[in-house]
Structures are given as C-alpha cells and as structure tokens.
Amino acid sequence: MDADVLNVGVRFLLYIELAVLFGVPLFAGWLLRSADNVAVFESWRLTLRFIAWAAIVTAALGLSVMAVQMAGAWNAAWNRKMLLAVIGTPYGQAWLFRIAALFGVAVLLLWPLRRAPERAIAISLAGIALGSLAWGGHALALQGPARAVHLTADVLHLLAAGAWIGAIVALRGMVASAAKSRDGDDIRVAARALGGFATDGTVIVATVILSGSINGWMIVGFEGAAAAIETPYGVLLLAKLFLFSVMLWLAALNRFRLVPKLETALNEGQRDQALGHLKRSLMLEYCLAFAVLALVAVLGTLAPLPE
C-alpha cells in the first residue's frame, strides 16, 4: 500500500474518532441541559473509552506513517531515530499532546463521571486531542502571526465540527433507541434534546462557517481562488462545501419541520411516521458528516494551488 494512501486513511480514522470522542460527551455532558445528561453520558461511556484507546492506536500508526513519508522508506516506520526526528517537528510535538490527552480521557472513562467538573475535564482533554490535528494541516506552511491566526482558526474549526458531528451521533442514537423501545418518555427526551440544541447548534454552525472562511482565505486567498478551482484540492473543496450545505438544509429541516411534527404526533398518539422521518433525516446527516470528514482527510494532503 502507498504511504500517502495510508496517511489519508489514518487521518480519516483520527477525524472520526476524535470528533466523536469530543462531540458526543460535549453534547451529552454539557449541551444537553436537562436531568437526562448524566444518563446519556453514562450510556456512551464504554463506547467512548473504546474509541479513546482506538484513537491512541491510530495516532501511533500515524506517527509511523509520517516517518515513512519523511524517509521515503517503509523501514522508517519502526526506526527509533526516525521516529524521534518526527517527534521533534511541530507535528510531533502536537502528537505528544494528543497521546497524553487521549490517555487521560481513557483513564477518566474507567469510572462513571457523574459530576460536571469530572465530565468537563474529560471533554477538555478530548478537545485538546482533536485540536492538535491542526498541526497536521496547511497552517504549518506559514510563519509568524499568519501561522498563529491560521492555527487558531483551524482549532476552532475542528472543535466546532467535532461538536456538530458529536451532537448528530448522539441525537441519532437517542432517536434510534427511542424508536426501538417505542417508549413515550424516551421519545419525548429525544424530542426535547433536538429542540433544545437549536441555539447551540446555530452558534456551532456559525463558528464552522467563520473559521472555515478564514482558513480558505489564508490557504488560497481571494486572488488564488480561480486557480485553486482547477486543482484536485479545489474540486474536493467544492464537494465538501456542497455536502456541508446539504447538512445545513437537513439541520433546518429537523429543527423547523420534523421536530415540531414529532411533538404534535406525540400529543395525538401518532408518532411512528414522524419518528421514522426524523430517524432517516438524522441518518442521512450522519452519513454526510462522515463523507465530509473523508474529504477533509484528503484535502489536508493536497497542494491548494498549482505548482
């Protein structure tokens, strides 16, 4: 297998793992402002612990792949001197923070986190791990204040995207569980969670758009936009923006049509059809989110402008 292809695969896995590891507990333990948040967080704890350990393995593989790419030889994957050389780069320094944060999350999730400060620590560590991925992107090609601005925008973009994806994953799980149990109380909890996420979701989406716009401007600039469209980077970026716009449309559909329809159906005792529509919409949004992550994994490895 080509090292570049393996690098894209590792990046994709890390994006999925770290987005879920940060976003799901953020939603369940913080954004879900109700008495249900502890129960929802606890229902995910074992899964999140598994994801934390899986992310450690993926991150370790990522370091070896980076060593292979730097050396141009597969035996660099386990060469101590080459691995230490990678760790000495900005990418490697971020990798150390990522690994330390992931170990912290994995250890914390060994026990139930019933108090808000405990959950906040786990969420913060997961956020550090997710934000550290910014040091594997285009920002490192810049120097001085420009690099700092780009890295800040990258970190905000990653955290906001992780919060949105985690919320989608958690909400889909709540709706699927409610549909399976057919329990009216479970369905009402899911409906409340969907309705209550509206304000937070708006802030998250605004952050994604603003930080993404800053990133785009710093990578290609206004002058380079036309040239970038003619490159594979530009084509994939347009595809990402299209999928993102569809996700926005689905989020609006859920908020303004499907959730109110479910609430009305609950009061009338006719919930199955409304719940099915909402479940399918969230599933589609879920799939689109992972498609966007796949595109992001590739975009970070491509040159944005023609050579």
Language-model-detected regions and their locations in the chain:
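Polytopic transmembrane helical bundles with strong interfacial aromatic enrichment
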Residues: M1-E307
